[in-house]
Amino acid sequence: MEGLAGYVYKAASEGKVLTLAALLLNRSESDIRYLLGYVSQQGGQRSTPLIIAARNGHAKVVRLLLEHYRVQTQQTGTVRFDGYVIDGATALWCAAGAGHFEVVKLLVSHGANVNHTTVTNSTPLRAACFDGRLDIVKYLVENNANISIANKYDNTCLMIAAYKGHTDVVRYLLEQRADPNAKAHCGATALHFAAEAGHIDIVKELIKWRAAIVVNGHGMTPLKVAAESCKADVVELLLSHADCDRRSRIEALELLGASFANDRENYDIMKTYHYLYLAMLERFQDGDNILEKEVLPPIHAYGNRTECRNPQELEAIRQDRDALHMEGLIVRERILGADNIDVSHPIIYRGAVYADNMEFEQCIKLWLHALHLRQKGNRNTHKDLLRFAQVFSQMIHLNEAVKAPDIECVLRCSVLEIEQSMNRVKNISDADVHSAMDNYECNLYTFLYLVCISTKTQCSEEDQCRINKQIYNLIHLDPRTREGFSLLHLAVNSNTPVDDFHTNDVCSFPNALVTKLLLDCGAEVNAVDNEGNSALHIIVQYNRPISDFLTLHSIIISLVEAGAHTDMTNKQNKTPLDKSTTGVSEILLKTQMKMSLKCLAARAVRANDINYQDQIPRTLEEFVGFH
């Protein structure tokens, strides 16, 4: 029956109404109920024939299912829309989101609940507002759709229409008494969303309906949001309409100019100077009441520059692009505050430009500053850390010197991030645990890349001690992957993933130097994964024993010298020798096998099924157990 259900689903998906009818012809009522309620899984989506037909706009199929087979309109599934995964979506939600008006009318006329919500509390009306379909929006509202239902983030239909730039939908919702001053969880209103996206007609419409100028949860007004996003026309409109004080007006102009200096999509150094100069003139407009800047202390990442405090100082750097770039970063940090989530992005962008121009020292200064800001704000930094591994690898590949203190600094931040991500994984909801675990494992791999890079860097004895301390600190936390792999397991495993943007030019696994360094810093040589495998069990399965003989040989020697038990058994009762996949690893292992009397005794106890639990000291129980 499952095979038939697949054909039924395919016919519904492709709009083949006659094929669908033929497949269901002369079937019993229970069979039909099963076939039309069967949830098919495809590409991460879970849907019934009705849901997929509605999603794809097949009105004839939908009509057949509703009128002839009386399929329930409230079936729910999981669908993908514009890169988003929507759980708990009905056929009506799908039809509204995909813009299939005829299907929407069919479903509503057959009793579909216009206010049914998905798992994230999204309604069919919200889906239509996202897509900008005014005809569907009007129809749903006329059929009692509630315009005030917000999603789980308290984001309303008006907000999503404002953000997506659907002016006609925004106007209609306002006419239907949608609240222009409703706030999302983040404290933002529809005016914030429209201003950020630069939809000036919607900003005008919202102002006409007396939308209030309020701060969001990050202390940002719509004016500041527009300035930070380089939306100059919106800034100028709000300055002409909004009743803002002199300081707010000046800071909006400064923030706008500063943002143009370091924005990938909107970079314009002429506008940077223009708006910074306008703001400076406003500061000095009234000679009796000059509004002085509260400048930040010099910051190393910004070349220890001090922000321009008068028109003459600003004019002096007019032709100096680099100085204007730094001025922009300083101004943004002063106005937005170091803890603002948006402060770090332009710093990272400017650092990337330096890296592209082979000015690595400047790049690293800026990225370290951004990393510290993000960690101070308790932001997820797995991408930032990986970025360092990439640029350090690029430098080594180009024979550029990497400074050991920089590696140590990033390793220290990496340990902190891994510790925080371990706590996130423990305390997160089941729905988000997969993503959190991905980030956490990514951080472990990045840490190993950084350790690998450190082995290829000139270090003083003091620098090496500092690096080793960070490695020790992480080993002490004993982080594990989903498979139970320790750092040592990952270091000896050819399946450990290596990032392919510069990093794989320098880093590879298994890695003898990384293995030795981890062992020197206290890694437990006999630690086991979820299958009971030690690092020795893993390395003897390496499938390049000839071409990479030195790596295989060095790692086996290092592990054995560090106390690896060559007779240790995993959960399948296999020793490393049993797990060897090549003659080379087998020979290498046999030459290192020096069986102690203690190991022989432990194996004899296990081989003869002698009861040893609670008969010998606890430490010896564990020792006998892994033999």
UniProtKB/Swiss-Prot annotation:
The UniProt site entry described as Cleavage is assigned to 342-343
GO MF term list: death receptor binding; ubiquitin-like ligase-substrate adaptor activity
Q: Which SMART domains match?
A: ANK
Subcellular localization(s) per the UniProt record: Cytoplasm; Nucleus
Activity regulation: Activity of the CRL2(FEM1B) complex toward FNIP1 is inhibited by BEX family proteins (BEX1, BEX2, BEX3 and/or BEX4) in absence of reductive stress. Mechanistically, BEX proteins act as pseudosubstrate inhibitors that associate with FEM1B via zinc in absence of reductive stress, thereby preventing association between FEM1B and FNIP1.
Impact reported for residue 186 to S:
Abolished ability to promote ubiquitination of reduced FNIP1
Q: Where does the chain bind Zn(2+)?
A: 186
Q: Which SUPFAM superfamilies match?
A: Ankyrin repeat
Q: Name one GO cellular component term.
A: cytoplasm
Tissues and organs where the protein is expressed, per its UniProt entry:
Expressed in pancreatic islets, within both beta cells and non-beta cells (at protein level). Highly expressed in adult testis; expressed in all types of spermatogonia. Also expressed in the prostate of neonatal mice.
Q: Does the keyword GTP-binding apply?
A: no
Effect of deleting the gene? Abnormal glucose tolerance predominantly due to defective glucose-stimulated insulin secretion. Mice also show defects in prostate ductal morphogenesis and secretory protein expression.
What pathway does the annotation place this protein in?
Protein modification; protein ubiquitination
Source organism superkingdom: Eukaryota
- First-listed, main subcellular location of the protein, grouped into a coarse class: cytoplasm
Q: Which GO terms describe its biological process?
A: apoptotic process; branching involved in prostate gland morphogenesis; epithelial cell maturation; epithelial cell maturation involved in prostate gland development; proteasome-mediated ubiquitin-dependent protein catabolic process; protein ubiquitination; regulation of DNA damage checkpoint; regulation of extrinsic apoptotic signaling pathway via death domain receptors
Residues given in the record as Zn(2+) 2 binding sites: 186, 218
- Start-end of each ANK repeat: 45-74, 87-116, 120-149, 153-182, 186-215, 218-248, 483-527, 531-568
From the UniProt record, list the TPR repeat ranges.
Answer: 344-377
Q: Which family does it belong to?
A: Belongs to the fem-1 family.
Record note on quaternary structure: Component of a CRL2 E3 ubiquitin-protein ligase complex, also named ECS (Elongin BC-CUL2/5-SOCS-box protein) complex, composed of CUL2, Elongin BC (ELOB and ELOC), RBX1 and substrate-specific adapter FEM1B. Homooligomer. Interacts with PPM1F and PHTF1. Interacts with the death domain of FAS/TNFRSF6 and TNFRSF1A. Interacts with CHEK1. Interacts with NKX3-1.
Q: What does this protein do?
A: Substrate-recognition component of a Cul2-RING (CRL2) E3 ubiquitin-protein ligase complex of the DesCEND (destruction via C-end degrons) pathway, which recognizes a C-degron located at the extreme C terminus of target proteins, leading to their ubiquitination and degradation. The C-degron recognized by the DesCEND pathway is usually a motif of less than ten residues and can be present in full-length proteins, truncated proteins or proteolytically cleaved forms.
Protein name per the record = Protein fem-1 homolog B
